[in-house]
Amino acid sequence: MFTTSSIIDNLNQSEGLEYKKLCRLLKITKKSDKDKLDIALTALEKLEIINKNEDDEYTCIKNSDHLVAKIRCSSKGYCFAVRGKEEEDIYIKENLLNYAWNGDKVLVRIIKEGYRRRSPEGIVDCILERSNQILLSKVEIINNDVYAIPIDDRILSKIKLPKENKKYTFKADNKNIVKVEIDRFPIGQEEGLGHVIQELKLNNNEEYDTDFVLSKSNIVKSYNLNNLDSKKTEKRDRIDLTDKNSYLFKSWNSNNSPMLPMIQIEQEKNKSTKLWIHTNNLAERIDLTSKKSLEILFKGFESLPLLNDWQNYLSEAIRNDSEFKLDEKNEAISLCLHLDSDNEIINWSFHLTLVKCSLIVRSEHTEALLTRKSKSRITSRVLKPIKEYIEDLDKILEISCSFRQRHILEGKVEIPSPLNNIEALKEFFIHNPAEYSKGYFESLNKGDCQTYLSSILYEANLIWFKHSNQYGLKSAGYISKGIDYVNANEIIKYSEFIDNDIELNEDGNCTFSQVIKLCGDDNKKRILHKLLINEFNNNEIRLISKNIDNDESEKLFISPWTIPGFDFTNLINQYCIFNMIINGKKSKKNNINPINISESNSLDLVNWDIFNSSISKNLEILFNKFVIDKLNEFKYKVNQYKSNMINIKKVRKAEKLLGNIYSGFILSVQTYGFFVEISELNVEGLVHVSTLNNDWYEYRSRQNLLIGRKSKKSYKVGDAIEVKIIKVDILKYQIDLELT
């Protein structure tokens, strides 16, 4: 189904499109769909967003007054059109939303310019794309009609349901929420219409938790992955490395988890090393020039953890053909790093290879390797069966630690992963070496072998940015922002968690890493880590090209490609590498004096475009603003989902312990109360100011505390207190506490 956004995106990418060509691009063949397209085109013309020239071609009006934005609403009903980080938000009054909902992509027209500290005001003229096709709602009867009332109070509409949906009327005891599919969005004087597709009875019932949280995060799996075919790979020249030992480091337990790369090590006599990273050859298996494949991939850009399982973004057929299996030959796309005796990277090269997995390295292996007392005598029952591989594994772990040490010296920050004591959430807390949306590193952890894979893959991903950028190729990736933006005043608020004996360096400073280590108490340390994590912004995926803005030219870029089984970003970067290896031009003209463009030694020798126009056109379909925006939208939903899934399971845990009393620490203080972490349970809850009935408490922002007017009793971050669990709200993921 096409959207207004897809019409405008197609028109923006061309000088002019005839009606038939537009239909072809939008895959419209049915008369009913063409009728809808006609209505949309007429409306867009009247709004002066597009026009039709004398050649009967549709084009976007370049200097239109309309701005593309996303609607963001608060629970109190205030709505803004958000344009971007550098642009000012536009305030939209409720009566000027024209039924745009929170999260919708819209075209906004400014009707009143901003002045002083007031935001500009605007009106929504066109809804480009709806973010909600499924609504979680309560069913209520209003004037004998049946309506779905969204549980998300940022959505300011109700949906009319058929009479037969009356049986789903909300009962507080059952907490019976329904999933409503929208048949027609509200427009003009017409109400929105929908129908119930599923009832979720949430009260003391964990069966529907995953379904509930996925729907609340707007992640709807309405597509069939089996339609994503696995291509048969062509016979190509590959380096045969099947006689060498390759190691697959894996902590994830689910069979459905993302496929991981393998590491191979070759130690030379002069103490230099060849370090190979072998990645699953998905770029060869998936036809990224096929509209059918892209249509499926665009509906789910990333694999995500469920309870004790994963929702993979790739079909089972593709995974079966590409996954590295023990003692089986596999085709791979590989990077070879040449390291000196100090584990510094001297040069690198990309290759097509044939490999074989010798050992699946588990977390018990890394723990035994890193905690053993003697390196000459093997006594561990875990290590005895893998005795022949220990020398290689020791070297891989040494290289991983060297790389990480270098990253920290360059200014990166390491924070340990939060603790988890809920068995169902185990896969959520295992380190994901493909995750770069966080602004910090998770610490190397001998109990999680994937953390040691992470620092090696980080280098491999940095290298693809350097290589692709030198050739003027686009890539999808992240900017490493450093920590300059972190608010020092917020960190000062957490001083209650830090020991008093702080040592400053000769410049009178204390590094961020030192601050993290200054807390002695384990419970306080864990809470400090949690608070510090909140100070880091999430990184967004960026379209990286040769023409980097001046203010970004000194920043560190990373272009992930090593785990294409995790997400679309890795896949398209790997696809670019694959094309460089098999289709890249090796000389300026007719292969005279060809050079190996896959080697780092060739980077300064190439002064020509390495791809012809056909390959460049295929890559342009993948590397453009539209795709990057979609990737970020999906990534935002997935991050919301993961956070909410953890929260609902914590609430479920507290639900079984109502009335119990626990010790805790104050995490943060607000005008309406303070949040407390119960260390024993690893859950957080709110003590509302209204429950502090022994005095009138006021919030002092400078000191970040609540203080009683009469008693002068204060509550601040880091205070140890005792609380009772009095109430939980599954729908809002909230735990209410009171002081004892």
Language model: regions and residue ranges:
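Charge-lined substrate channels and their catalytic hotspots, especially those that engage the 3′ end
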Residues: M1-K274, T279, A283-K329, I360, ...
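Electropositive polyanion-binding surfaces
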Residues: R24, E164-N165, K179, F185-P186, ...
